[in-house]
Design a protein with these regions (language model features):
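C-terminal catalytic domains of large/alpha subunits in multi-subunit enzymes
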Residues: 1-153
Length: 153
């Protein structure tokens, strides 16, 4: 049995062209749920997933050199701080309750993965739309943005 749920993301960013820093100002996540059993929990799951996607897009990277992980702990592994997240009122979850899924509990579909995926390309494309820097490798770092703005690859 498969639960095919669809999702889409949109983000608004501000990019500092002097430093390459990106701030996600607003983000929207639309998800097909089938039937939302508990809409508040669905909203919290969606916003948590968008936050995870922001971390994946802008900060998180496992650095490996000669087979050795150079950032094996949260001391060295970058994750976003609360101050680097959009304000709660700037994260919006949009739920599409399609026909109840015949095999899902009470007609619901699984949607946990869909709330994370899509943030990375949405952020990379928002950076491109804002300043013309096309970043093709995650994370989208200030260094990569500045290099792209200077004409590097």
């Amino acid at each position: 049995m498969a639960f095919y749920a669809y999702a889409a993301k949109a983000v608004e960013v501000a990019v500092n062209v002097d430093t390459g820093e990106v701030q996600v100002l607003r983000c929207y996540g639309a998800t097909d749920l089938g039937k939302a059993i508990n809409p508040k929990i669905c909203e919290q799951q969606s916003e948590g997933g968008m936050a995870m996607g922001i971390g994946s897009a802008l900060y998180e990277e496992t650095v490996i050199v000669n087979g050795l992980i150079l950032n094996p702990s949260f001391t060295d592994y970058r994750v976003p701080l609360a101050a680097q997240m959009p304000a709660n009122e700037c994260m919006q979850s949009i739920f599409v309750e399609s026909a109840p899924h015949k095999d899902g509990p009470f007609g619901a579909k699984g949607f946990a993965e869909g709330v994370v995926t899509g943030m990375e390309p949405a952020i990379a494309n928002a950076v491109y739309n804002a300043v013309g820097a096309r970043i093709k490798e995650l994370p989208v770092t200030p260094e990569k943005i500045l290099q792209a703005l200077r004409g590097g690859s």
